[in-house]
Amino acid sequence: MPKLNENYQNVKDSYLFAEIARRVKVYEETHPDKADQIIRLGIGDVTLPLTKSVIEALHEAVDSQAVSETFMGYGPEQGYEFARKAIADYYARNGIEVDPAAIFISDGAKSDTGNITELFSNDNVVLVPDPVYPVYVDTNTMDGKKIIYMNGTEENDFLPMPDDKVKADIIYLCSPNNPTGASYNKEQLKAWVDYALKNDSVILYDSAYEAFITDQDLPRSIYAIEGAKECAIEFCSLSKTAGFTGTRFSYTVVPTELVFTASNGATLSLHDMWNRRQSTKFNGTPYIIQYAAARVFTEEGMAECQQNIEYYLSLIHISEPTRP
């Protein structure tokens, strides 16, 4: 008889967003006259179609698959070089230097923020903001890791800060935060980087909503902070930036500077460990998707996406009457 991972007994039977979707569906079926009045606070899907340049790129990539000279089969697990360079160029336009070799392309930030836990022992202490994206808690609960919560409240502007009395090995930060939208400024992020460096911790930084930052003084990447490449992994996605919720594209930055000492005294690179994990368990994001995503990261592509983002930002007022 197999021995089961009994940590699954400690997670709820249904994932939060799946449960919200189920309840909404039941309500729609029982109240069809009110279905169009529902304000959905679940997974937060997009409603606008993919942009013109992305659709054109998808057609180009599909057509290339019909010609033997341009057909693409298995690709590199880390992602095609052209796509990783496009991402690095996007970082550069925002004043941040990221080595394309540190970028790993995947099918969603959900996958990577969940799978990254495989690099860390289950006896780590994990620090998680509350409220935040539920994947962080569920995946670490499934692993059996100890979770400590740091409360985001109105008093701290929903941006919890380091507490020197708390020792954490793994720190999750999400900025802009899902679901509050609160964003850390440079001084606040520096405090977190300093804390991580002092305590030999790793920050898992989710920047999936970075394109929604309108204040130019706010950092769109943790790598805007000196020392971050020695203590932080960054996750980002095109789900909300470019409407890729159904198309699926994300990227994770694991700097080569990110090294820790194993219990046997060996120095291990998280970059090399993640590369080994991905090459074993992931066959790469489809070429067609990467080709289209690379178009997003051009100046023209981002300008088109920004129009959609401005539309979504204009809808924020809808939630105002529901706030306490």
Regions found by a protein language model. Name each.
Residues 43-48, 79, 110, 133-134, ...:
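Short, solvent-exposed loop/turn segments at secondary-structure junctions
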Residues 3-107, 115, 296-302:
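N-terminal small-domain helix-loop-helix segment of the aminotransferase-like
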Residues 68-196, 210-225:
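Conserved core of the PLP fold type I
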Residues 30-32, 96-97, 223-227, 267:
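Short, conserved catalytic or adaptor-binding loops enriched in Gly and charged residues
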Residues 314-324:
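Residue-level detector of conserved catalytic or cofactor/ligand-binding positions
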Residues 225-310:
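Conserved core segment of the aminotransferase class I/II
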